C-alpha cells in the first residue's frame, strides 16, 4: 500500500519518463522502487532510519551529495527539517532544476509556496487525497553551509553542559519540561551500561555521563540529525559515549543496567504508541538481571497498564501535573 502522497504522484507518471530521479524528505513507502523501470536511475535520501532500514539503496544521512534530472520531495510535518533539507538540495542543484513537492495539507504543505518563492517559480499542479502537489523550477540558488544551522543552549538543570542541535531535532532550542523532570531523578549512583533510547540531541545521556563518569553511555535514535547532534553534544562537552542509529531495539546489541528514555508520544500529528509499546514490551530482553527501565511520559497516557503487564509493578519516581517518571526493574 503506497502513501496518499505517492497516490497523487501516480497521477503524474509522465514527469518520470527516462529521467534520473532523487526522492527525498518524508518518504514512507516503496513507491520510488516501483518506478525503477520508468526512470533512468533512482536515488533515495532519508534522514529516518526506521524507513531506511526497511528499503533498498537508501542514503541515510544528514547531508546528501548527488544530482538528478528531477527531485521529488515529500513534505514532512517538521518545518525546520523541511527548510534545512530543501535549502541543501537547492544549493547543490543547477539553475533550472525541476522539483516536485508533495505533502498532506494537514502537515502544512501549503507553506511551500512562501518557502520557495525567493528561489524560483512554483505552482500548484494537483490537489487530491487531501494532498497538494507543487512544481518548482530553480532560478536563484541559496547558500548552504551545515555549520550555519547549529544551535546551542544551556540550562541551570544541565550544570554547564552545552547542548548542540540541528534543525528538526526534538527540543532543539530549549530543555523540555518532560526531560527536565526525568533529569531530576538522575544521580551519581548510576553505574554500568546505560542506553539513552531516542536520544535526540543527547541531553539525557550526556547528563548521566557528567553526573556518573564511570557509566558506559550508548545513545540511539532514528533521526540522522538527532544522532549528529548527540555526537556533537558529547564531543563539545568532552564526554565519551557511543551513538548510532536504531529503530527502538532494531540494532541494539548486548544488555544494559539502565534503559532511559523520553519517548515520543506523538509523531507529528499522530500519537506514536508503536514506539512506546515496543520500548516497554521488549525492554526486558535488553536489560541485565536487576536492570531498570526509566521513562518520562505525559501523565494522561496509559503506560502504567503496559508496565504492569510486562513488569508486574512500577514506581513513580517524580511527577508534575503533566508528566510522570516511571521506573520498573527486570
UniProtKB/Swiss-Prot annotation:
Its EC number is 2.1.1.172. It comes from the Bacteria. It holds the Pfam family MTS. GO terms for molecular function: 16S rRNA (guanine(1207)-N(2))-methyltransferase activity; nucleic acid binding. The keyword Transferase applies. Keywords: Cytoplasm, Methyltransferase, rRNA processing, S-adenosyl-L-methionine, Transferase. GO terms for cellular component: cytoplasm. CDD domains: AdoMet_MTases. NCBIfam families: PRK09489.1 (NF007023). Monomer. Belongs to the methyltransferase superfamily. RsmC family. This is Ribosomal RNA small subunit methyltransferase C. It comes from Haemophilus influenzae (strain PittGG). The gene is rsmC.
Amino acid at each position: 500500500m503506497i502513501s496518499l502522497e505517492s497516490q497523487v504522484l501516480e497521477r503524474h507518471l509522465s514527469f518520470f519518463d527516462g529521467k534520473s530521479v532523487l526522492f527525498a524528505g518524508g518518504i514512507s513507502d516503496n513507491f520510488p522502487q516501483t518506478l525503477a523501470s520508468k526512470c533512468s536511475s533512482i536515488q533515495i535520501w532519508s534522514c529516518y532510519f526506521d524507513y531506511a532500514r526497511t528499503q533498498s539503496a537508501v542514503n541515510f544521512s544528514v547531508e546528501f551529495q548527488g544530482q538528478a534530472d528531477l527531485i521529488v520531495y515529500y513534505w514532512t510535518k517538521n518545518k525546520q527539517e523541511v527548510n534545512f533539507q530543501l535549502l541543501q538540495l537547492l544549493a547543490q542543484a543547477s539553475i533550472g532544476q525541476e522539483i516536485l513537492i508533495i505533502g498532506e495539507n494537514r502537515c502544512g504543505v501549503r507553506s511551500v509556496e512562501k518557502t520557495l518563492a525567493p528561489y524560483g517559480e512554483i505552482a500548484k499542479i494537483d490537489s487530491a487525497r487531501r494532498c497538494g502537489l507543487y512544481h518548482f523550477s530553480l532560478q536563484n540558488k541559496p547558500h548552504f553551509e551545515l555549520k550555519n544551522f547549529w544551535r546551542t543552549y544551556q540550562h541551570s538543570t544541565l550544570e554547564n553542559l552545552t547542548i548542540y542541535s540541528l534543525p528538526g531535532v526534538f527540543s532543539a532550542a530549549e530543555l523540555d519540561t518532560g526531560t527536565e523532570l526525568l533529569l531530576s531523578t538522575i544521580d551519581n549512583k548510576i553505574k554500568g551500561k546505560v542506553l539513552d533510547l531516542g536520544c535526540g540531541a543527547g541531553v539525557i545521556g550526556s547528563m548521566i555521563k557528567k553526573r556518573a563518569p564511570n557509566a558506559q553511555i550508548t545513545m540511539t535514535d532514528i533521526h540522522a540529525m538527532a544522532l549528529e547532534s548527540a555526537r556533537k553534544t558529547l564531543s563539545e562537552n568532552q564526554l565519551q559515549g557511543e551513538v548510532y542509529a536504531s529503530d527502538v531495539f532494531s540494532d541494539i546489541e548486548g544488555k544494559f543496567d539502565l534503559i532511559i528514555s523520553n519517548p515520543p508520544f506523538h509523531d507529528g500529528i499522530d500519537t506514536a504508541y508503536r514506539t512506546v509499546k515496543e520500548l516497554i514490551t521488549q525492554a526486558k530482553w535488553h536489560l541485565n538481571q536487576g536492570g531498570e527501565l526509566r521513562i518520562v511520559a505525559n501523565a494522561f497516557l496509559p503506560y502504567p497498564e503496559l508496565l504492569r503487564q510486562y513488569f508486574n509493578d512500577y514506581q513513580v519516581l517524580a511527577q508534575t501535573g503533566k508528566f510522570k517518571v516511571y521506573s520498573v526493574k527486570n
